[in-house]
């Protein structure tokens, strides 16, 4: 299986409006005579490549530490889409994924600038997929 790195560079990717930009600060530097290098790093949890756990949108949803890591590793179906993903779009994406490769259909990546509608989110959540991701 070929593995694709779709992670975004933290300091080069777009920051969600209203969120603080990531920052890094050199605390210790061997170049300045210290015995080691040390850097402090801060960022909003929604910057760069990240996971939105169910808790992000569901009051009693699971937090990131409670998620099963196996859901994040494996074959995935990539569906290119731009704009709002509707109920019908979600249904069609799931059907096409299952037709093309049932194993890959367990993890669906939406490629493009998308917004998942509430109706589409419910379809994805009620299906048997393990992961829904967005890669711009």
Name each region found by the language model.
Residues 1-136:
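Active-/binding-site microenvironments in catalytic and ligand-binding cores
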